[in-house]
Amino acid sequence: MSGHSKWHNIQAKKGKMDAKRGKIFTKIGRELIIASKEGGSNPDTNSKLRDVIAKARANNMPQDTISRAIKKGAGELEGVNYEEMTYEGYGPNGVAFVVSTLTDNKNRTAGNVRAAFSKHGGNLGETGCVGWMFQSKGQMIIERNEDMDEDEIMMVALDAGAEDFESSEEVFEIITTPESFGEVREKLEAEGFEFISAEVTMIPDTTIEISMERAAGLQKLIDKLEDDDDVQNVYHNAEFPEEWEG
């Protein structure tokens, strides 16, 4: 996938996220609760929590909302117990999907995810049926401007342990292992760089190009899944046309 096409897909997703800001805060709040519950409420000693806090800040989540979620996870405030569940399957046109969820009711979530796939031309599969097509990677996106020195950003990222660095007219994309994500992000933040997005994600090894004629049908499935409060992330290997507006 070309850098420009990657950015187009990221940009389209970001536009949708901006329109659903309250829902995004709810989803990130659940991630904060889980991270705090599993590793404690101190980000200095909990790298997973540090990473989720960075994701929250990249999405302009208010600090008091972040703090409340962390306290719920640590048991300092009353909260709900969530379980992590992952679903895999195929959407229309053979597109592979990995759907990560945090739920307080596994039966409800499984039913909703299965119904979304069935209604929009897909099939929910067994665990592992498509997961092998993706790799867990840290991904940071920095919006490019004329004052930025590409070589400087690249050297900071690579020296800190980044695996890959790509640039386009609009953005710089930095890829890391999940283990080195936090360190690379912190080094870039220390140099004053701000992120459009910064998170550990699932990146497909190969992508399927989707025509304009088929894009709308696939987008309906993605939107249906992302609209579910229990769904945290929807990963797929579709590459939408550059002119697709979602």
UniProtKB/Swiss-Prot annotation:
One of its GO terms (biological process) is regulation of DNA-templated transcription. It is found in: Cytoplasm. One of its GO terms (cellular component) is cytosol. Pfam families: TACO1_YebC_N, Transcrip_reg. It comes from the Bacteria. Coiled coil: none annotated. Keywords: Cytoplasm, DNA-binding, Transcription, Transcription regulation. Belongs to the TACO1 family. This is Probable transcriptional regulatory protein CTC_02215. It comes from Clostridium tetani (strain Massachusetts / E88).
